[in-house]
Amino acid sequence: MSLASRMTSVGGADNYGESDYGWDETVLGDMHLNSAINLDLFKEFLHIDPPVYKVKENHRLTEELRELQSLARKGSKIEIGFQRLFARMFPRDGNLIPMDSTMTRMIMKIIRDSGTKYKLGIPLLGISEEMIKKGAMVPSNLVYSFNCFLNIIYGRSEWIRSEGIAIRFKMYEHGRFIRRDLTISEKEYNFIVGKEVVEIRASRRKERFIADYNSLLLLLDVAGQRICAHLCSQLGEISGVPGSLSRYHLETLCTAGDRMIERCGNKAYEVLGMYEALCVGRLLENNPDGITDHTQFSANCEEELQELIAGSVEPAFMKSQVDLIKTTLEKMKNQDISNAFCLYRVWGHPTVDIYEGMKKVHTIGTKVKVIPPNLGTIMVCQFRKMFMSTFFKKHHRYPPITGTPGEYLERCLKDNVAIRIEHLAYNLRDFEFIRIGETYSVPDTFDMCHVLNDKAVSPDMSELLESIKNGKGTSCGAKRRGMLRWMEGDSLNCKSFLSDIDEKGLSEEDLLIGMYEKEREIKVAARMYSLMTERMRYYFVLTEGLIADYILPHFPEITMKDSLNVLLKKMWESGGQRSIGSMDVNINIDFSKWNTNMREGPTSDTFREMDGIFGFKRLIARTHEIFNASLVYSASGKYLPTIEDGRILDDPPMCYRGHLGGFEGLRQKGWTVATVCLLAYLSEQNKIQMKLMGQGDNQIIRLRMPTSYWDSLRLTEEMKKKEARILSDKFVHEMDIIFTGVGLPIKVRETWKSTRLFMYGKVMLLDGRQLPQWYKKTLRSYALSNEGTLTISGVIGTIATNMCAAGGGSEVPCVMYLFFLLLAEWSLEFMFRYHPFTRVGIKDGSSMEFRLNEKGGYVHKQTRKTNNLWLKSLLVLVPTAVGGSVTIPLTGFIMRGFPDKASEGYAWLKFLGSSKSPIQGFLKNFYTFLPNDTVEADMLVQSPFSLNHKRPPTPGLQTKENIREWLLSTPRFQQNRFIRSMQVLLSGFDKKSVCRELLTERMNPLISHEVYETFGHVYCEGIVARVENTRTIRTLHLSREDRKPIVAKLMTDEMAYIAYMWWRGNTKGEVFEECATKQARKGRNVGWKREIMGITTPHPLEVLFQSVCRPGDQCQRSDDYITSKLVDDGKFPPFLGSKIKNKVYSLQDEEARREPLIKTGARLARQFNWIGMGENMRGLVLKNVGSICDVSVFDKFVDDDPSDNLYTGSLMHRFTPSSVSEGCFINYAPQVGHKVFMSSDTLPSLSRGQTNYTFHFQAMYCFLQYSISKSGNEGSYHHHIMCQDCVVPVEDEFDDIPNETPSIVKAQEEQYVSIIRTTLGYIHTKPRSAMVLEDKSPIGRYIEDVEGHEKELYSGVVELLCWKSALEILGRTRDTHATVGTEDLQGWPRIYAYKVSRRHIIGKVTSFILYILAVQIGELPLPYSMERVSRRAIDVVSRVGLEGFSAVASLCLGRDIPMVNDVVTIVDGFAYPETVSVCLRSIKASILMTIGKVIRVDGFMSRRSVYPTESMTSDDFLRILGFKAVIFYGCTKIHEKCQLKGLDQVTYAEMMCHHRCLEKLLSSNLLTHMTMDRAMKYLPIKITKILPKISSTRPNTIAVTREVETENREFSDTFPIDERVTYPEMDLKTNQMIQYPTSSIYKWSDILLGIEHYDHVVVMGDGTGGTSMVAAHMFPNSTIYPMALLESKNLIPQDMESLAPPMSRKLTNVDSSLLIDLPDDIRKPTFRTRMLERVSLMRGNILIISDIEGTGTLFRDIVSTCLYMPTSTDVLMKTHLADLCGSYYMMKGAGRIRLRGSRLANLRYGEVFVSFRVTGGNIRPNRRGLGNCIQEVMIGLMNTQIETATGMLSQIESMFPLAADMSMNIAMMKMASWGGSFSRKVLGEDGLKLMGYVYQYINTHYHFASSSYRPGDNRTVTPRRKEDLTKLLCSIMLGVYGEDTETIEEVSKYTLIGSKKGVPGKSYFKVLMWKTGTKRALEHDEYMVGRAIRNYRTRILEAKKLDGPIGLPFHSGSLRKIATWGYKIPISASGGWIDNHLQI
């Protein structure tokens, strides 16, 4: 019966009845190449190079070949394989023909028009129709060849399926074959196609090419790939896509390879296999780094290439083509080479040689290797160390250890402190005689899904013998299907199975390993993969699963289990922006046959250690024992083993025993751990830090060079490069030695090094930028490129998915969407012409029928006549979530993971429908909602985000039900206990009814879904579904004769789907709202007939683009918005996306969370209160879990949280069930984000409020970052959040389900529960796991309600945060939050910083540091001993790296105002802008200086506090109370106990004293069950801005002002004015207290005191904020706008205040908007116009102040910019007389010009101030008048009294006390950076005492090296340290002695020297200050620090400066005196002792 008779039309309705049993359409055969090509059987039959092994005959193939030979002409030449036809059929063709791009151009116009309306600003909008037309051109021969091959393949399919002649494809029968004659590339070919064999005859040449059907598919595949490459290359090149190859380069590469194959045949692939290496070599050569040898890799490749070429048939020709490839690569840019690297499959694949592949495995795998036993010891010791260290870091304790540890390790275990490899006592041998005990136990309910897979397996021994005896060879048919074997056997108890293997091993019956050739490899010698027997496969799968789940998390270097986003983050951290200019060396290791070379010797101890961790004796350790005992054989089906005496004989290499190595993929994770251990060992031995990323044999090492150490040695750049070269070469050499020693040889020739190129897998990063590699996915993006049922939706989905993945490696993913459209249009064109699955075409203008569910039945629908262009457009545009196909909208190409696809779909349709187009009506119809008549509850529960559309029946649903019915009832599988049980179990589980009973009127489908998942029935049903969806089961079912039609039904469903799409586009539903978000929200409610909560999420396309203010736009909106700043040369850390973090705290047992079968129920149980789950639903969850587990065995399974304080966050944002994406992430190259700074600080109502809103911040950032980065206009963007329907408060409340509903009650009947327990197992005892920690809840007095205790709660929160931050600073571990970007301050959530005081944080952190260190040194943190404690603290904290302060820094981003002369010192403003490193340095300096000031710590602590217990342990609480007992009660007992046992070990009982100090504190320090996040909700946002100080008595200005004569004429003199004038002699800068960060405060205060009021003041060049601070105080009623050049673009992500100048950012009348809105550089072309736009919007009087530093042309730029402003704008600019006199004529249009001078300015540089008003016209300064004015101003300044000027300094300092305080703080910070941390008290001492203290400080902290010294030793005086300490001493001497000429002359001659033996006496004096004969130019900072110290001492403390000579130690002057203090030694008057003991 034909298909046509079963369809009423092209999309006909389903008319199958009972009589149709047994009839069906034939299954569509493969049209996708999915296996390796091996033609050994052809060679054997045709006697052409026949294989050397015994071949099993294939009778069907033989018959076809025999008939083919009979049809052939005599004398014709035969060749096996089609590869040599590439050059003939795909020659270089100058003729290009257009591909149909009508659909693409139409859609692009829609996107272009809509995107312009939306102000989307992406590159896609700039691609015109003409560009697409021009780009959519392909070589004509490729298109013609592809169509020919396609027709032949279609014809063969039609011939086989209809068992007749494929007439429509012009083919005719020819015996067992069909035939077609074609002309391809002007050559005639005869195609003779059979079911197995294909022959292509070149008519004129009398050549015959014979191969299998796969070889024909290869021809199609190569043609298809090349069409994809050409289309995307040409369009990409025209549209400027990075990585787009020119047509010339693409064709040159393809043609060179084709020619090589044509001349040398299959052997050419050996040379082409080097193509990727040539690309990498070219990249390395293009990018030398001066450290590594950038030519070495290419040279090594050249050697190998020459060997391969020499062995080829035509060496000279091969060399010429290889040279052509190399020459082509040389001409290409880096990004083009990277993309061309992905073309390695464009030449197809060779015919593989099975024998050679087996020979390689046998040769390497049986080679006996002598491996030194010590290497195995090293490996296992390193494994133990790494496992224990990471375990301790996570759990704060060690796993169980047995044996005898070494001395240092024993101490670490005893004291429970972290192992530090830098500790002097550390020794790896400490781990040699210990064993890690059982840490994890195998779950009783081990997940069955681990072993269920439809992959092939090897038959067992008896089955293989039987198959060979029966003449079936090694194929064994159904015995090879793993799924079928499992079903026909019995189900497996995983734990029992593993225990049995542990005891007995595998039986001989199971010891077989079949080898088969891997597909799609460019290797002639086949790459062999392994087929294990069923039980062997279970063994490896289960043990590898254990390693993956429990071992790998302790090795973060291994990336095997990392998700895509984690992998991206790791790659970006290793090779991203921070690697630019780095000397760190990337080493790309290439192991030689990594798996096969693995041997038992070095790994056995490590594997036994893994066994011990799981409580086994010899499980994983049996790996090599199994390999060695197994029969290894070729399982391709072509080899026939020999049997003798019932035993298979060895026939190496095709069949052998005694394999000593490993096999690919069989112990991958275990061997990866072993490899990582050896690499880590090498790193430690070489004392070099290493960043490692690895999986299997792909190991990438980044050696971190000790550059800071080299800096300390003052090495030059060249010397550093030399050291880096030596270190990296040494590392590679030692790596080669050690891996060769363990039998894993490294291909040193193919291992390459580079500091610039980073490559992991196939992903490349060069100089911190990800290189494009989109060809890899592009080549697989056409209709026949992937396996599976060939459907329209599947084709579109495949192409969309591939091109979306291509976008992830591109800087322009939106253009990848254009490629998707074009490639989809091409595929749809030939699919519409003839659909190979349905066997019919889709005719334009035809009508179609299909049926819909309506009113409980089916209704037939007739469509209008089709327009195929519009139908194709709908198929590619409309996503499935809104009723379309499996496509991906443009938005999905830009970011991944947006959860609500319906909301995204409606936003996309609204976007497309916003512009006029031929399909606008269709798109608007799809935007409407057509509800389904029925509510399918199971669809809602199982697909929580879905909409209930009116759609045709789900394709294949009835077929699946039929398969399941047969599967569960057929006797064939009844011996399988699981299958047998399922028939009964699922009969009692009515899925639809159960789901219906889970629905409520107001519901959250995600919760219902999770509750549904807790049913044991659902887990079992999932296994059944997994089984029934396998290819094996589908094939078995299709082979039944007693079934209903399946294929024909699917064919009808396919056509019905197409018909529905056209009908739906013509049918209008209901528009609920114009807002897409609300349309989705209401669509859900209407469709499901209930209120759906917690699902609908606004998409950025809908929310962010309704009101966009771009650079230059006038923004007058006051509503919330996201601020973004685009800087073309930006270096901002990119936002990569973030993972959703659940914020529910739970004490639930760890074992309950890890049990796979109850983990869903366990998650719900610990979140009951947060979810707000009703009692009935809770009961159902617990009852469902109870069917698998007795929850009473756990100490805590359900969290009781009556106060609701154990969680924060809404369900919508934080609930992460399995059905939801783990987060939102970018889908483009990360460097795109460098140009964009984004912040939600201008979105306070959503980002800092107490209410949760339906706003997806991660999605907004991901989308905005891309949109803005590509907009092209520098400046700021405001994306206003306008729609009140989109972003609404989250509603999490939902209804409870009814109690005791019938279907649920039935499902939980005892008979079904019993089956679940029998099938899956039952947990009746608590699983053993050493991971579980004891309950650490603090002991104390708890309160439930914190109302009325807000102040105490604030104290407790701050104390707890500070305690944890202090521990982190001092090297303790703490679980930190995952960072959002690549460099951020997210140690604590950003919101915390807005609610706590920076002063409190720094004060309390300092207190805790002092306490902890006081305990360590045996002192009390009380005033009488504080000096010693402080010194120790300064020592320790000084040595902590910046990363140690990340947690405390994240708490200080609120930046409240510091207090003057406060004990808590806050260092602010020493650099602009505030980068992460600047912030960390300032926090570190603040803590150091606060330590130096602290005398009493009790002032920082509160006697009464309330602590949130769920964020602290009992240890935390106890230590904090212990500290309070000491400082408030002076309790010495507690302190003594802490000293005796250590802070970590002391207990409650031991801290009790007879004064009852602890009891008192326990009564006043309360606890509350609350998380830190919840506690923060109770704290208000701090007000951090202050009003500017308005002084009642403002001083009078001492500035001198003169008006400049002007003239009005068009042309002016351009002769310079002679500016030679006499300046006042005295420079008052030396008397200024404010030196840092700027002293401009003085001069601007003086100048502005004489200026009248303005409404708006713009201050240019004000990075420090000093000038704007002065202006804010001088004009308190004005708005001040600071502007500055961003000297660094590496800002703190999302932190607006890091852009604001630090000195003025907290003043209420300072507005930083111009900093955001305008380009940061006045010289940028757009600056002037943008400035004019903003200034024009200001109302009132306007003053522009310029404090920009610079001379020459910059003066002209400033003047011309200011004169460009609106008339009547006043300007006041700082300049220099030289610039003014040389360029005065530029001031055309300036009136009311005044010249101002101040005695407080830098007069020695001629610094003056010019003010003028912008008038326009020809007014300008008169040359002579300006010259006279200059003379008058200078005379006036000379007449200003010095006393008047110095008095003015004091008055200004009193106006700005914070600035004076800040200056001293920064000066002290500068001293700390030079190596000396001194308190103000010390700096205020008598001059001699201060010098003596500093001298003693240096001698107690530093020493000259006696011999060698190591990196990280901060006490050794290296050359750099010597320079810094010399600066320190010189600046202090300037501060003590003054800054007169004689002092400077003397100070500049001093340096540090070292005494070899020291001065004998009571103490050793080894570092001396010595005067040399050589003067050193003192640096500017030395003067500034000296002045700060001197003015602090003389003007604040009124100390006197020292007089007299400085002298020499022990010899003369001041140094003679201070050298004797504390050193009772004889002093020689001549100083002879010193002369004999000095070391320079």
From Swiss-Prot:
EC number from the UniProt entry: 2.7.7.48, 3.6.1.-, 2.7.7.88, 2.1.1.375
Keyword Secreted attributed: no
Classification lineage: Viruses, Riboviria, Orthornavirae, Negarnaviricota, Haploviricotina
Molecular functions per Gene Ontology: ATP binding; GTPase activity; mRNA 5'-cap (guanine-N7-)-methyltransferase activity; RNA-directed RNA polymerase activity
Coiled-coil positions: none
One annotated Gene Ontology cellular component of this protein: host cell cytoplasm
Subcellular localization: Virion; Host cytoplasm
Main function: Displays RNA-directed RNA polymerase, mRNA guanylyl transferase, mRNA (guanine-N(7)-)-methyltransferase and poly(A) synthetase activities. The viral mRNA guanylyl transferase displays a different biochemical reaction than the cellular enzyme. The template is composed of the viral RNA tightly encapsidated by the nucleoprotein (N). Functions either as transcriptase or as replicase. The transcriptase synthesizes subsequently subgenomic RNAs, assuring their capping and polyadenylation by a stuttering mechanism.
Organism field: Lettuce big-vein associated virus (isolate Japan/Kagawa)
Mononegavirus-type SAM-dependent 2'-O-MTase domain: residues covered: 1632-1811
Protein name: RNA-directed RNA polymerase L
Record field: catalytic activity: RNA(n) + a ribonucleoside 5'-triphosphate = RNA(n+1) + diphosphate; a 5'-end (5'-triphosphoguanosine)-adenylyl-adenylyl-cytidylyl-adenosine in mRNA + 2 S-adenosyl-L-methionine = a 5'-end (N(7)-methyl 5'-triphosphoguanosine)-(2'-O-methyladenylyl)-adenylyl-cytidylyl-adenosine in mRNA + 2 S-adenosyl-L-homocysteine + H(+); a 5'-end (5'-triphosphoguanosine)-adenylyl-adenylyl-cytidylyl-adenosine in mRNA + S-adenosyl-L-methionine = a 5'-end (5'-triphosphoguanosine)-(2'-O-methyladenylyl)-adenylyl-cytidylyl-adenosine in mRNA + S-adenosyl-L-homocysteine + H(+); GTP + H2O = GDP + phosphate + H(+)
Similarity remark: Belongs to the varicosavirus protein L family.
Keywords: ATP-binding, Host cytoplasm, Hydrolase, Methyltransferase, mRNA capping, mRNA processing, Multifunctional enzyme, Nucleotide-binding, Nucleotidyltransferase, RNA-directed RNA polymerase, S-adenosyl-L-methionine, Transferase, Viral RNA replication, Virion
One Pfam family of this chain: Mononeg_RNA_pol
Statement: the UniProt record of this protein carries the keyword Secreted: no
InterPro entries in the cross-refs: L_poly_C, Mononeg_mRNAcap, Mononeg_RNA_pol_cat, Mononega_L_MeTrfase
Occurrences of domain RdRp catalytic (ranges): 583-768
Domain of life of the native organism: Viruses
NCBIfam families: paramyx_RNAcap
